Amino acid sequence: NEEKIKPLMIPVMTDSFDAVVISDYNKGYLTTEKIFEIVESASCPVFIDSKKSILPNKPNCFIKINDVEYEKLDDYNIDNLIVTKGSEGCVYKQTLYPSEKVNVYDVVGAGDTFLAALVYGYITTNNIDESLMMGNRAAAIAVQQLGTYILTEEDVQKILY
């Protein structure tokens, strides 16, 4: 007997955060309504990596998806949509931000690494263009390793301008 998965009840309290990051793998813990509630109440930027097909379109919200997830979206009219394109880099507002060409050993965790560097870049520079390139550089470092890779301090120095 499997227990029915219940949606995660998260109190919305984002006032003291520099950013909110939502990684939602659409397993039923985080409802679409809760994501919208978090975005609506946030006084800081919200970064979402989600498998859901309905996503918020708000000025303070950045949505990161990959090519496959892009094809499944219900609404393509999202202002701050970031589409990761593997070795090509990412697209934001119809502009390609190219990635450095590297030898790829393992892509596991590359999207999470991209998102972490993107968020770090944005909260430290408030510049989305620089942040996207930081995300690309971080993911390029991660895919050169076997398995899930956590950036070192030396790696972080490499991704900074």
Predicted features and spans:
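Conserved phosphate-binding/catalytic region of the ribokinase-like
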Residues: 13-19, 33-59, 72-161
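Conserved phosphate-binding/catalytic loop of the ribokinase/pfkB sugar-kinase fold
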Residues: 1-17
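A short beta-strand/loop micro-motif in the catalytic core of glycosyltransferases
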Residues: 61-67
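Short acidic, glycine-rich surface-loop motifs adjacent to enzyme active sites
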Residues: 17-29
